[in-house]
Amino acid sequence: IKHLGKLHTLDLTNCDQITDDGIKYLGKLHTLNLTHCDQITDKAIKHLSNLHTLDLSCCDQITDEGIKHLCNLHTLNLYDCKNITDEGIKHLSKLHTLNLTCCKKITDEGIKHLSKLHTLTLFWCDKITDEGIKHLGNVK
């Protein structure tokens, strides 16, 4: 992978043999999909801070510690990332698009930090209440 210098977009969905060591070569991509890449950890995420779009759906080892490096992305998909909490998403306030579907630990407190988003997906986020939605009314 490290020899693909002109590559723009890479989809590695379900490539469960990809590890943190392989990810360090992908920081210059525009778009990267790592859905169900089960061996990817927070250690790899720091190499992806310059991407435009990143999909980490169902990457169970990703935590708040990893996503704090992703504050400059345009689009981030964290679908079913079970270890993401309010603490992690507060670092994502500059994003344009964020998917938090099935992120069961996200509460009203977390989404109030997301005022610059244009698109936010919160399907099956059971801890979001009217209070959290009220903050979204102030989205700029």
Model-derived features with residue positions:
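The feature encodes a structural signal of leucine-rich repeats
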Residues: 1-2, 20-24, 42-46, 64-68, ...
